[in-house]
Amino acid sequence: VMNHYNNVLKVYKKTGTFWEYYAPEDAAPGFMARKDFVGWTGLPPIADLIEYIFGIRADIQDSHVTLDVQLLDAYGIDRYPLGADGNISFKVAKRSSVNEKPKVTINTNIPFKLTLIWGDGESVEKEVAVGNNAI
């Protein structure tokens, strides 16, 4: 996913626009692809970034969020929606190794269950309360 995300970004920086689809072997627009066309290209900057690069996946039915931290850099997201009324902000601090437990700050207006995953399968589950939470 990171490779695809970076290639879409390279093409955007080169051409100044998004394309209908991209070349499979190069950071270039696909053959006969239409420019200024979001279509499937809308997935990498939104869904892929949130779900696969930031590692945030939600199960609305169970009010459960999985945060699978793979990055070493600090990152975050504000107002991540959970259900009709939920707004959650996640801030993950910079780490020095993948096996270092992530430090996560969460601000939420609804309670939910969190599974935090990192390293070689390490994980912790926590009930997150309304307000500011440090994990």
Please identify what each model-predicted range represents.
Residues 1-135:
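Non-catalytic C-terminal accessory modules of carbohydrate-active enzymes
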